[in-house]
């Protein structure tokens, strides 16, 4: 029986952080190890260029870092196909064909695109590549005939646009070549979106409010000790608020079942007074290090041979290109433009 296909990936614009880990990486490893799916994981460097075209050196450097992050959290190139988007030219060709099936007005109505345009402050200077990247995403997904795409709830419009393109193509060319994917959405969106250390709604590379998977223990300690807590909890004996307190929020997310009693007692103690922020932060540091130490150790080991890391990416890209090439051949056959 053929396994369902999952496609997922990241834009290589920097090292990955705990937000990526909680939001997607942990779940990818679980799905991979269930051995129920064919998993494709890609580094979306072409998509990253849509708003980093003049900073391509960042993307080049980030490819190696993101690949190390993938390997360190447990993504296994013998179980998942890990590849680089730009090394699959068939994706760009599929994008070109799909562009003829989508109106400019439809792209401009995409809520995700509208939100991101506003966030990035493009104004009237929107790069064409950025505006059409939902079509590029559709090419990525349909090239591998992905059945499932794990994304956040904010990406639902992108999945729907891919489904529309697949439907439109199949209807226009009287075929059933393209698969309409389904999104896999987090059951608890709050757990899947980790706030920044400063209390900002989202951990972000650009805001500098994150803990990176590659951070050493001393860096993690300094970041944890600077975390946002209750600004009114000035003295240890003062009652403190746990709502909006990032230390307790992180304890809820990263604590395991065996930590539940201790965390509950700390919350009660903090709220009645007598528990200082330093003590809660030290406990959080223990919890985080339990998670990060093995990741850091594996990352350092893989980083000793970057040549091998890039050979892994090359091998994965070659395997991915074979799959995408087959889909492209079917698409061209259906369109009547396979001449030889």
Residue ranges, per PLM feature:
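N-terminal Rossmann-like or analogous alpha/beta NTP/dinucleotide-binding catalytic cores
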Residues: 2-139, 296, 300
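Hydrophobic alpha-helical segments
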Residues: 6, 16, 25, 159, ...
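Structured ligand/cofactor/substrate-binding pocket environments in proteins
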Residues: 16-22, 40, 54-59, 78, ...
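Alpha-helical packing segments of well-folded alpha/beta enzyme cores
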Residues: 24, 28, 62, 66, ...
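Short amphipathic alpha-helical segments at helix-loop
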Residues: 51, 143, 147-150, 301, ...
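A short secondary-structure junction signal
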Residues: 109-110, 146-147, 206
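Conserved nucleotide- and phosphate/pyrophosphate-binding catalytic cores
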Residues: 163-340
């Amino acid at each position: 029986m053929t396994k369902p296909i999952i496609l997922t990936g990241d834009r290589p614009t920097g090292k990955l952080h705990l937000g990526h880990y909680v939001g997607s990486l942990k779940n990818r490893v679980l799905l991979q190890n269930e051995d129920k799916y064919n998993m494709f994981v890609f580094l979306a460097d072409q998509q990253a260029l849509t708003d980093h075209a003049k900073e391509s050196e960042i993307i080049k450097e980030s490819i190696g870092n993101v690949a190390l992050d993938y390997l360190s959290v447990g993504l296994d190139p013998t179980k998942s196909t890990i590849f680089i988007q730009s090394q699959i030219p068939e994706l760009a060709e599929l994008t070109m064909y799909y562009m003829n099936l989508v109106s400019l007005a439809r792209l401009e109505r995409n809520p995700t695109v509208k939100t991101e345009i506003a966030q990035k402050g493009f104004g009237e200077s929107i790069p064409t590549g950025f505006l059409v990247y939902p079509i590029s995403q559709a090419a990525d997904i349909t090239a591998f005939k992905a059945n499932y795409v794990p994304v956040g709830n904010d990406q639902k419009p992108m999945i729907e646009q891919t489904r529309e393109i697949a439907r439109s193509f199949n209807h226009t060319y009287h075929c059933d070549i393209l698969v309409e994917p389904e999104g896999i959405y987090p059951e608890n969106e709050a757990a899947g979106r980790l706030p920044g250390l400063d209390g900002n709604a989202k951990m972000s590379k650009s805001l500098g409010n994150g803990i990176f998977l590659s951070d050493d223990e001393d860096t993690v300690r300094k970041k944890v000790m600077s975390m946002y807590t209750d600004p009114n909890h000035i003295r240890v004996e003062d009652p403190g608020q746990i709502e909006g307190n990032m230390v307790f929020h992180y304890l809820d997310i990263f604590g395991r079942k065996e930590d539940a009693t201790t965390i509950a007692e700390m919350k009660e103690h903090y709220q009645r007074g007598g528990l200082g922020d330093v003590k809660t932060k030290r406990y959080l540091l223990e919890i985080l290090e339990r998670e990060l130490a093995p990741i850091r150790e594996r990352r350092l080991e893989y980083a000793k041979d970057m040549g091998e890391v890039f050979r892994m990416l090359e091998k994965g890209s070659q395997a991915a290109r074979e799959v995408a090439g087959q889909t492209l051949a079917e698409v061209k056959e259906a369109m009547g433009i396979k001449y030889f």
